[in-house]
Swiss-Prot record:
GO terms for biological process: L-arginine biosynthetic process. One of its GO terms (molecular function) is L-glutamate N-acetyltransferase activity. GO terms for cellular component: cytoplasm. The keyword Acyltransferase applies. InterPro entries: AceGlu_kinase-like_sf, Acyl_CoA_acyltransferase, Asp/Glu/Uridylate_kinase, GNAT_dom, NAGS_kin, NH2A_AcTrfase. The lineage of its organism: Bacteria, Pseudomonadati, Pseudomonadota, Gammaproteobacteria, Pseudomonadales. Pathway: Amino-acid biosynthesis; L-arginine biosynthesis; N(2)-acetyl-L-ornithine from L-glutamate: step 1/4. HAMAP family: N_acetyl_glu_synth. It catalyses: L-glutamate + acetyl-CoA = N-acetyl-L-glutamate + CoA + H(+). Its EC number is 2.3.1.1. Belongs to the acetyltransferase family. ArgA subfamily. Keywords: Acyltransferase, Amino-acid biosynthesis, Arginine biosynthesis, Cytoplasm, Transferase. This is Amino-acid acetyltransferase.
Amino acid sequence: MPEYVNWLRHASPYINAHRDCTFVVMLPGDGVEHPNFGNIVHDIVLLHSLGVRLVLVHGSRPQIETRLAARGLTPHYHHGMRITDAATLECVIDAVGQLRIAIEARLSMDMASSPMQGSRLRVASGNLVTARPIGVLEGVDYHHTGEVRRVDRKGINRLLDERSIVLLSPLGYSPTGEIFNLACEDVATRAAIDLGADKLLLFGADLGLIDENGKLVRELRPQQVPAHLQRLGSNYQAELLDAAAEACRGGVARSHIVSYAEDGALLTELFTRDGGGTLVAQEQFELVREAAIEDVGGLLDLISPLEEQGILVRRSREVLEREIEQFSVVEREGMIIACAALYQIADSDAGELACLAVNPEYRHGGRGDELLERIETRARAQGLKTLFVLTTRTAHWFRERGFEPSSVERLPAARASLYNYQRNSKIFEKSL
């Protein structure tokens, strides 16, 4: 079977979920200059064709720097913000104007050899962002550098209803007719909040947030962000992370940080279960909970391969439906990726931990320990004093977690009478 067939099948739930949703996508000026920019445009057009309502915000910092250098002007910053005097503002207007036209031209391609053939999409822009001056801070006059006052929510939604891609530039206008240079991250964040967007997608140079060990941080809650900001200092990763967290605090369900250098990063983040960047979300991305009858299908998908290998005892759908209240599960993006069951042994103060299983793709994230802790908590709440487990393959895992070797003779009578000598499982117990 071709690989793309399998990919489409797995992506279909996300295609349905994203249809008619509003996404704000921020692409910095470095991303527009990157060789991968053409692929990003193709992916944006694909999202539009799948029914996503798109607001695209572009940056222009390197383009402004180029124009300042060409005129022999020195850029000035204070606390990471550009000081935009009159001469600098001319460079800003020139850079933003040319960049906006170049992006519109890319989005208008309709060549037979292009993935955009037949798209015929419309790009809309205009005076949709109202700004105000930052003014004087710590004795420093920022001149024409501003901050977003509001975005035209009704106007943008009307354009989105007409199936246009809305393009916002890092310029804002005041009611008195002044022009202000804005940070594209500020524009994107405020647009996402004011529009009540479903997602804010921020492009950066890296795959996402990189931790102190050089590894990608895949998921964060907004309350975890300050610690990372302190570690990062004042680099661009910190700006993106701060924007993502601010959007979530403002009501945006999910913010994503992805790489403009990675071909397909946007699609991977949106149409696969684990994504390819960093997700900042208010709600839990992964949830440990008690199982419900609706989980039976997911449980069967999880445990059937292990049953075929002889690792787990076979359980039919009927058995799972009847015993579903004994199970705890780990759910990730609607998929059951781990489970465990607790059975109270009749006429005793002991219980049995059974059917502990973790999807092979998620076996190194501590989910087995999470489920074991949950089962032990449930057992104590039921007044149980001892927890037994019978296993053929994972004896060492349980030994490392406080289980001691036991025997059939130690099992309560009700469980000992059901022991399968042909399976010859090893027995362990743990005092609670």
